[in-house]
């Protein structure tokens, strides 16, 4: 009886589905190919890009305060602040500067380097912008980076905020264009792009991302990333939100997104927008420590911290600090990019 000597099988890694690029637009096909990579290959590529641009052990802490809550006229299917949905969120007026100052001081004492103020408006009026500009000056005087998310901006609004010291303006695209109409009908996609253009022209940095887990396909997630990566330039800050299902909203009963699909979205965002801050935003409370750790490995390097994000829950500060300690990671210094 003859014996056959067998040699160990050699491992041949798959050829990259998309070659590294320095310039040029990303197609949805190219980005979908990234999503389709074997998970270890995708994570390796994302971590490699991350290390080329950031210290992979550092995470930015940002705080988000709702300075004007509820009563919004829009119909965003995920949002508990829409007046048309019965979600238990009570409308409130714009906070006074002293209240915002106290909140910013608490955030700074807890380690935040960026302070974002959110107001539930479809589009603020001129008088609203002047009041928010006062809030920006108040927070900026503490030495914190400032960010605001106020809805659609008209001509001149971004310039007023920039003059007050605003560093970043957040205005998310939310989804790919071909899924957008399924979740929002009161504002079209071009409205969002127009606001981003006004922000850029005023010299304010852009914070722009989206929400996943709303029922979109993987290709539509690729479409969202393509829209973000092809902005000129792409956003300095990219918040990726995992849908938080709120009773009373149309998406309250949406099926959960596979956690690995969320991690893939983070990794693809990192590869396609190498120097952006990729932020874990809404939905962290439902992820657990393991998924968050994978997201950091995939290139996320910023979180919103504090026990509430606008109107929904978020891990408490101590839990975030403990998680970073367990991972041998730490908070980053203010962004000087």
From Swiss-Prot:
> Where are the stretches annotated Disordered?
1-23
Co-factor binding details: Binds 1 [4Fe-4S] cluster. The cluster is coordinated with 3 cysteines and an exchangeable S-adenosyl-L-methionine.
Task: Give the EC number(s) under which this enzyme is classified.
Answer: 2.8.1.6
Q: Which residues bind [2Fe-2S] cluster?
A: 116, 147, 207, 279
- CDD domains referenced in this protein's UniProt entry, alphabetically: Radical_SAM
The alphabetized list of GO BP terms reads:
biotin biosynthetic process
Q: Where does [4Fe-4S] cluster bind?
A: 72, 76, 79
Database matches in Pfam families: BATS, Radical_SAM
* Enzyme class, UniProt record, top EC level: transferase
- The UniProt record lists the Radical SAM core domain at 57-284
Q: State if Iron-sulfur is listed as a keyword.
A: yes
Q: Name one GO molecular function term.
A: iron ion binding
Name any cofactors this protein relies on: [4Fe-4S] cluster; [2Fe-2S] cluster
Q: In which pathway does it act?
A: Cofactor biosynthesis; biotin biosynthesis; biotin from 7,8-diaminononanoate: step 2/2
Keywords of this entry: 2Fe-2S, 4Fe-4S, Biotin biosynthesis, Iron, Iron-sulfur, Metal-binding, S-adenosyl-L-methionine, Transferase
Family classification: Belongs to the radical SAM superfamily. Biotin synthase family.
Biological role: Catalyzes the conversion of dethiobiotin (DTB) to biotin by the insertion of a sulfur atom into dethiobiotin via a radical-based mechanism.
The protein, known as: Biotin synthase 1
